[in-house]
Amino acid sequence: MASKKQRIGVLTSGGDAPGLNAVIRAVVKSASSLGWEVIGIHDGFEGLLGTKSYRVLTNADVQGLLPRGGTILRTTNKGHFGPRRSDELSEADPYVRAVKAIEEMGLRALITIGGEGTQRIALELHKLGAPVIGVPKTIDNDLAGTDRTFGFDTALQVATDAIDRLHTTAASHNRVMVLEVMGRHTGWIALHAGLAGGADVILIPEIPFTIERVAEKVHARDAQGSAFSIIVVAEGARPRGGSEMYIAEGRLGGIGHWVGEQLERLTGKDVRVVVLGHLQRGGSPSPYDRLLSTRYGAAAVQAAARGIYGEMVALRGQDIVTVPLAEACGYLNRVRPHSDLVLCARSLGIVFGDEL
């Protein structure tokens, strides 16, 4: 009698990022080489609660996905999976319903591709017995337990290209250009892009700033004969003693325009603000993100083959390893204010707005 074909599931959850489709492709191709069947679950964890919210994925389904942005499985960062507030098992509990769905589908493993929120949900499912394996995704690069998340490199490329373009127009008109980039709680995109693009000021959540110090930098450049300035600000940056700014309930944003308005008042210069927004999430992944996503997808299937659950694949040095989901969800990977990158930037004269 032939043995039953092994089956694994894969879903994408949270905000989209370049490289999601590359992970899905690697999962399908790696599982296919083992003779396994892959079930693609639509709309993140919400797909575990619906009917007919999944489909079998074959090698034919993932042809041409490497350079393609977005996710063929769709994703959401809203829905039923908030923090579990009780250990009681209820049929109405979405987590209990999800675990039951995983069992009914006969999944040997469920590969969850997402950031900190996604892996936190995966951890709760694992506590209820689900065989989950996480894959780290976020353009913010703020997920703990891994040296790098996929999506970050592409977002960095987009932000750096924007700075390069803003340099020419800023210099032509002697303007101050403020570029707001993503980074809710961490400043990795702003810091890396600011360094790579030659910014004059970098404002990040980890280092509260004073607008007066930023204005001083603009005046200093004017005095040195450089009548334009480039300022990169993460969306979660905040003035000293202040708080994060929101453009709508639950949606960070607005700090770039606030910085621009204050600088016009303090310096009298022509200031223009550019909010990069979702351009950082869309489009084709960079070669590095394609490679990292592929390695993560293949490693997740290998973990399933070895029966390793409740863990997340991660980059450590040059190798892909697995780390406990609890470690990935325990804290955020933040920029250290005295890290080598920050010290390098300061040595180049880049201002973070905190200097006396």
Curated annotation (Swiss-Prot):
Binding positions (substrate): 138-140, 175, 182-184, 235, 272, 278-281
Active-site positions on this chain: 140 (proton acceptor)
PROSITE patterns: PHOSPHOFRUCTOKINASE
Known catalytic reactions: beta-D-fructose 6-phosphate + ATP = beta-D-fructose 1,6-bisphosphate + ADP + H(+)
A Pfam family the protein falls into: PFK
Enzyme class: transferase
Disulfide bond entries: none
Pathway: Carbohydrate degradation; glycolysis; D-glyceraldehyde 3-phosphate and glycerone phosphate from D-glucose: step 3/4
GO cellular component, one term: 6-phosphofructokinase complex
Binding annotation for ATP: 15, 78-79, 115-118
Recorded superkingdom: Bacteria
Any one GO MF annotation of this record: metal ion binding
Main location per the UniProt record: cytoplasm
Annotated GO biological process: canonical glycolysis; fructose 1,6-bisphosphate metabolic process; fructose 6-phosphate metabolic process
E.C. number: 2.7.1.11
This protein's record includes keyword Calcium: no
UniProt: Mg(2+) binding residues: 116
Cofactor(s) in the UniProt record: Mg(2+)
Subcellular location: Cytoplasm
PANTHER family with a match to the protein in the record: ATP-DEPENDENT 6-PHOSPHOFRUCTOKINASE 3 (PTHR13697:SF52), PHOSPHOFRUCTOKINASE (PTHR13697)
HAMAP family tied to this protein: Phosphofructokinase_III (MF_01976)
Subunit structure: Homodimer or homotetramer.
Function per UniProt: Catalyzes the phosphorylation of D-fructose 6-phosphate to fructose 1,6-bisphosphate by ATP, the first committing step of glycolysis.
Similarity comment text for this entry: Belongs to the phosphofructokinase type A (PFKA) family. Mixed-substrate PFK group III subfamily.
Stated name of the protein: ATP-dependent 6-phosphofructokinase
Natural source organism: Chloroflexus aggregans (strain MD-66 / DSM 9485)
Gene: pfkA
